[in-house]
UniProtKB/Swiss-Prot annotation:
This is 1-(5-phosphoribosyl)-5-[(5-phosphoribosylamino)methylideneamino] imidazole-4-carboxamide isomerase. The gene is hisA. The keyword Cell cycle does not apply. GO terms for biological process: L-histidine biosynthetic process; L-tryptophan biosynthetic process. GO terms for molecular function: 1-(5-phosphoribosyl)-5-[(5-phosphoribosylamino)methylideneamino]imidazole-4-carboxamide isomerase activity. Its EC number is 5.3.1.16.
Amino acid sequence: MIIPALDVLQNQIVRLYQGKYETVQFYPFELGARLKEYADSGAGKLHLVDLEGARDPSKKQWQHIQAATKALNVPYQVGGGIRCEQDVSDWLKAGANQVVIGSMAVEKREQVKAWIEQFGAEHFVIALDVNKTATGWAPATHGWLTESEFGLLELVDFYANLGVIDFLCTDISKDGTMTGPSFALYEDLIKHNSTIKVQASGGVSSLDDIKKLKELGIGGIILGKSLLDGAFSVEEALAVTR
């Protein structure tokens, strides 16, 4: 599945390079119109991130994002600044099909477990951003500044055992770079657990990348910068996955 992604900062569509806020690049597109364009192009799902809320939950842009998603006729998943049960509830009530949980899923596992038990595992995407280390893939949190005490596969097992099947994994070194995805990361994940649906994110720059990810058995391919920069269209990406 092709999943177009939009990151929002200061109520505008942006991209970051390797997650660093000082590298922000603003795009002159209106959020609601861009989402509609992606949906009309045949995307089966959309991905939204509130970068303001991710950095500072007191500055959430949820009103702006919810106004833009109101008329959407395709499912969407949303992340950024989701810190408590009420946040999960608010997004699901606003029409999100799934909430994307990142740092909290690494640092507050028992709390996230309680949310999953309350709202249902099908409403969650666990987002694990990793660095390659000598011992394997190490998840990092808080804008990728803090390394986790748990390994990637350990966290996947924890949430898979709770019934979660959607995992969004990003190799931090690839994010926003358009230098090709981290095929090794996705191979390791699929080899470890073939029942989960892995969403690949970061580095996708060509239709060939998409083709290779599909051949690996990836469940979803998140496309941000490549679509915004016009490397290819949603329709072209979909054609490669058919």
